[in-house]
Amino acid sequence: MEKIPMTGAGFVALEEELRFRQQVERPRIISAISEARAHGDLSENAEYHAAKELQSLNEGRIAELEDKISRAEVIDVSKLSGDIVKFGATVTLVDEDTEEERVWQIVGDSEADAKAGRISISSPVARALIGKKKGSSVEVVTPKGARSFEIVEVRWA
């Protein structure tokens, strides 16, 4: 079974979503199915079929969350240090063409949110940064083309 690296915050978020889906969504959906079933003929009961579809989607997501949680390798970023980029690092980059500064934290796949400054360990940018030191220049091939960045800071939250 392949381990899934994630931060403590990412692990907590998965646990919270699992709890919500099991303790709030599941009972709500079961209630909706019961209510729709009370309306009679199930073959033409759109409410019933919609609730059953929701149930299927919710149970599928619960199974996915349970799998991710069971395979999670929680990495305590606060115990990491150094100036080499690795999982959990918050990296400040400067685009060598535009001089634009960007800050990214390298996190697990399920935690990634580019708008919030968190990129997946498997993203092209993170793969290019891993193992590089502060002061290094890296070239990243993205869907928008090749970009060159200088690593100006590596910190650990």
Curated annotation (Swiss-Prot):
Superkingdom to which the source organism belongs: Bacteria
GO molecular function, one term: RNA polymerase binding
Matching InterPro entries: GreA/GreB_C_sf (IPR036953), TF_GreA/GreB_CS (IPR018151), Tscrpt_elong_fac_GreA (IPR006359), Tscrpt_elong_fac_GreA/B (IPR028624), Tscrpt_elong_fac_GreA/B_C (IPR001437), Tscrpt_elong_fac_GreA/B_fam (IPR023459), Tscrpt_elong_fac_GreA/B_N (IPR022691), Tscrpt_elong_fac_GreA/B_N_sf (IPR036805)
Keywords, ordered alphabetically: DNA-binding, Transcription, Transcription regulation
Pfam families: GreA_GreB (PF01272), GreA_GreB_N (PF03449)
SUPFAM superfamilies: FKBP-like, GreA transcript cleavage protein, N-terminal domain
Gene Ontology biological-process entries: DNA-templated transcription elongation; regulation of DNA-templated transcription elongation
Annotated family: Belongs to the GreA/GreB family.
Functional note: Necessary for efficient RNA polymerase transcription elongation past template-encoded arresting sites. The arresting sites in DNA have the property of trapping a certain fraction of elongating RNA polymerases that pass through, resulting in locked ternary complexes. Cleavage of the nascent transcript by cleavage factors such as GreA or GreB allows the resumption of elongation from the new 3'terminus. GreA releases sequences of 2 to 3 nucleotides.
Protein name: Transcription elongation factor GreA
Organism: Azorhizobium caulinodans (strain ATCC 43989 / DSM 5975 / JCM 20966 / LMG 6465 / NBRC 14845 / NCIMB 13405 / ORS 571)
Higher taxonomy: Bacteria, Pseudomonadati, Pseudomonadota, Alphaproteobacteria, Hyphomicrobiales
